[in-house]
Amino acid sequence: MSRELIRTADAWNKVKIARDPNRPNAKFYINEIFDEFIELHGDRNFGDDKAIIGGIALLNNLSFTVVGICKGENTKENIKRNFGMPHPEGYRKALRLMKQAEKFKRPVICFVDTPGAFCGIGAEERGQGQAIAQNLVELMGLKVPLISIVIGEGGSGGALALAVADKVFMLEHSIYSVLSPEGFASILWKDSSRAEEAASVMKITAQDLKSFNIIDKIIKEPRGGAHKNPIKMAQNIKKTILEALGEMKGTDLDTLLNERYNKYRNIENNL
């Protein structure tokens, strides 16, 4: 994608940038940002969803729980990770790890990059809606600092299930919306070919969402996009995480939870 296109990116071009197959995924950022990472598997109920990776990480001698929705770097890995569309067991695995973080008082860092939760019959039979709803409830009251970063696509409830947090950040050319532009166009106009038009009215860019105070900060991408300089992008994210933790350091638990609750209660006042 040309530098000129990046520079003048409108909403639809940002959709294309966010979906770029060369864009760094959650696995890359976890390995690049943290000094050590031990992956943990399974939801202790059905299985291990490869679309969500999570575990315990170290950064500057501090322990974290890290969870990320992960796309693949090639076709084979994309099939393994279901193109970043989690099943309910993925969301339950994520919640299991975050409740473990609460037990051991570890901050939680989430990376979000998904077109949406998987909507296959099996996923619905295993309680996809319930799994997402349970995450929303539990994250709102999780008794540790929570940071969520949208690194590519933030699609619908599948993204929100890992994005109820004290601090929500978006990369400069990422998107976050209730559904895809194609889905919006299909529902509203019965014509998915009008996706570009839909993107322009949906207010899905980081810049739009920051203006509504839905997110807290936009993390600047290297010139040409995150995929042009992944190492630099990881450094920018790392710096932002450490700054956010510094801001929350010393905040008592009641204040942390009240501010998190009010953050979401007040969103309607900004729309």
Swiss-Prot record:
<keyword id="KW-0547">Nucleotide-binding</keyword>
<dbReference type="Pfam" id="PF03255">
    <property type="entry name" value="ACCA"/>
</dbReference>
<dbReference type="GO" id="GO:2001295">
    <property type="term" value="P:malonyl-CoA biosynthetic process"/>
</dbReference>
<comment type="pathway">
    <text>Lipid metabolism; malonyl-CoA biosynthesis; malonyl-CoA from acetyl-CoA: step 1/1.</text>
</comment>
<protein>
    <recommendedName>
        <fullName>Acetyl-coenzyme A carboxylase carboxyl transferase subunit alpha</fullName>
        <ecNumber>2.1.3.15</ecNumber>
    </recommendedName>
</protein>
<keyword id="KW-0443">Lipid metabolism</keyword>
<keyword id="KW-0444">Lipid biosynthesis</keyword>
<dbReference type="InterPro" id="IPR029045">
    <property type="entry name" value="ClpP/crotonase-like_dom_sf"/>
</dbReference>
<keyword id="KW-0067">ATP-binding</keyword>
<dbReference type="GO" id="GO:0006633">
    <property type="term" value="P:fatty acid biosynthetic process"/>
</dbReference>
<dbReference type="GO" id="GO:0016743">
    <property type="term" value="F:carboxyl- or carbamoyltransferase activity"/>
</dbReference>
<keyword id="KW-0275">Fatty acid biosynthesis</keyword>
<dbReference type="InterPro" id="IPR001095">
    <property type="entry name" value="Acetyl_CoA_COase_a_su"/>
</dbReference>
<comment type="similarity">
    <text>Belongs to the AccA family.</text>
</comment>
<feature type="domain" description="CoA carboxyltransferase C-terminal">
    <location>
        <begin position="1"/>
        <end position="247"/>
    </location>
</feature>
<comment type="function">
    <text>Component of the acetyl coenzyme A carboxylase (ACC) complex. First, biotin carboxylase catalyzes the carboxylation of biotin on its carrier protein (BCCP) and then the CO(2) group is transferred by the carboxyltransferase to acetyl-CoA to form malonyl-CoA.</text>
</comment>
<keyword id="KW-0963">Cytoplasm</keyword>
<dbReference type="InterPro" id="IPR011763">
    <property type="entry name" value="COA_CT_C"/>
</dbReference>
<comment type="subunit">
    <text>Acetyl-CoA carboxylase is a heterohexamer composed of biotin carboxyl carrier protein (AccB), biotin carboxylase (AccC) and two subunits each of ACCase subunit alpha (AccA) and ACCase subunit beta (AccD).</text>
</comment>
<dbReference type="GO" id="GO:0003989">
    <property type="term" value="F:acetyl-CoA carboxylase activity"/>
</dbReference>
<keyword id="KW-0808">Transferase</keyword>
<keyword id="KW-0276">Fatty acid metabolism</keyword>
<dbReference type="GO" id="GO:0005524">
    <property type="term" value="F:ATP binding"/>
</dbReference>
<dbReference type="GO" id="GO:0009317">
    <property type="term" value="C:acetyl-CoA carboxylase complex"/>
</dbReference>
